[in-house]
Regions:
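Short Gly/Ser/Thr-biased coil->beta-strand turn/linker motifs
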Residues: 3, 17, 76-79, 92-95
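Terminal beta-strand-rich extracellular "head" domains
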Residues: 60-89
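Ser/Thr- and Asn-enriched, surface-exposed coil loops between beta-strands
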Residues: 47-49, 83-101
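Extracellular receptor-binding modules and their adjoining Ser/Thr/Gly/Asp/Asn-rich linkers
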Residues: 1-58, 100-126
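N-terminal compositionally biased, intrinsically disordered segments and leader/signal-like regions
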Residues: 67, 78, 92, 99-100, ...
């Protein structure tokens, strides 16, 4: 379970933790984690259109997750979650798809992938 200091929030579920942020894709090159927003995670490019977010802590479960993409130019680009393992590997995969195929996003100051994870920091499932 997470051991970091978290700030107060209100939720109907007990022991909810939120980890969110954004990163700048860099075409076919590695992501520069110094440009990330948010705390408690890093990201690595794993192949064409594949980004693996690694959390700083494990969590017993995930309640919800969202991801989106911001681009400097209009494109038929979408992001979706792939494998999620917050309990042992501490990883969340984000896949990028442009016109139904895996694709990289060009390096551009305005191009960012955003995500928000609502995590369960207890073994209680409800």
């Amino acid at each position: 379970m997470a051991e970091k200091i978290f700030f107060d929030m209100q939720a109907l579920n007990p022991h909810v933790k939120i980890v969110c942020g954004s990163f700048k894709p860099n075409g076919s090159s590695a992501v520069d984690n110094d440009d990330n927003t948010g705390a408690g995670w890093t990201v690595a490019r794993g192949g064409v259109g594949i980004f693996t977010v690694t959390l700083g802590d494990t969590y017993p479960g995930i309640l919800s997750a969202t991801c989106s993409v911001a681009l400097s130019a209009v494109a038929d680009t979408k992001v979706q979650f792939g494998a999620i393992d917050v309990a042992s590997a501490k990883t969340v995969v984000i896949n990028v798809i442009t016109t139904a195929s895996a694709a990289d996003i060009a390096a551009n100051a305005a191009n960012r992938i955003h995500f928000c994870l609502v995590l369960r920091n207890t073994d209680m499932t409800k």
